Amino acid sequence: KGYRNAVKQFIEASTPIGLFVDSDLPPKDKYLWFDKLINNENPEKTIVIPEGRKDSVFFMIQEMEAWFLKQPFCLDKWAQKEGYTKKETTNIAEHSILKNKNIEEISKPSEKLKIIMKRFFVKNKKAAKYGKLKTAPELLDALNVTALISLDDELRRFYLFVNKPVPR
């Protein structure tokens, strides 16, 4: 389990570092992630993050696809760059999957993104398909990171941690 090794390195680091992990939990339950470090069958394998270090653990509340859903304009930028045309004039943000929804609460954002891309974009009579390795890098480039930080509480917390002044 890669995250367990990352946690061990985080704990053993001599300088203050942050740890950004997938929580796969709703925002209100993010601290339940620490329970994954408890090993009831082999208690000696339990990992304990000291209380003073827990504030330096940051959670990816959702899959990164939630970021794209938070900023649907990045889909338009991607489509234009990749030669896709928009099938309908409806604003993507008005689609029932997104309208009036807290993106951090949407279940399986990668699946929702696939639906949105297939519904809205076409090239050579073929609907757009989302693939994490093929499509995500271009979509990441199209994000407005500054605006995204204000839409994602954990990302903002991480940004402030990374950009805090270093004591001299």
Model-derived features: positions:
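C-terminal accessory helical subdomains adjacent to catalytic cores in phosphodiester-
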Residues: 3-18, 23-168
